[in-house]
């Protein structure tokens, strides 16, 4: 029962963590773009 609730918690938290990672990546990208010689050049 306890492990089942942990599984549900992970299932609920997974999209939140993914969105947080995507947000942080986009923020890092936005911070990197102005300082780079060619913005959006290296992916």
Swiss-Prot record:
Tissue: Highly expressed exclusively within the subventral esophageal gland cell during syncytium formation in host plants (at protein level).
A cellular component annotation (GO) from this entry: extracellular region
Task of the protein: Plays a role in the differentiation or division of feeding cells (syncytia) induced in plant roots during infection. Promotes host root growth.
Listed GO biological process terms: cell differentiation
Coiled-coil ranges per UniProt: none
UniProt protein name: CLAVATA3/ESR (CLE)-related protein 16D10
Subcellular location: Secreted; Host cytoplasm; Host extracellular space
Family affiliation: Belongs to the CLV3/ESR signal peptide family.
Motif CLE, residue numbers: 31-43
Main location: secreted
Keyword Secreted applies: yes
Source superkingdom: Eukaryota
Keywords: Differentiation, Host cytoplasm, Secreted, Signal
Subunit structure: Interacts with the SAW domain of host scarecrow-like transcription factors such as Arabidopsis thaliana SCL6 and SCL21.
Keyword Signal annotated: yes
First and last residue of the signal peptide: 1-30
């Amino acid at each position: 029962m306890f492990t089942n609730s942990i599984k549900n918690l992970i299932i609920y938290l997974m999209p939140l963590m993914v969105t947080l990672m995507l947000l942080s990546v986009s923020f890092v990208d936005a911070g990197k773009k102005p300082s780079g010689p060619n913005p959006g050049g290296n992916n």
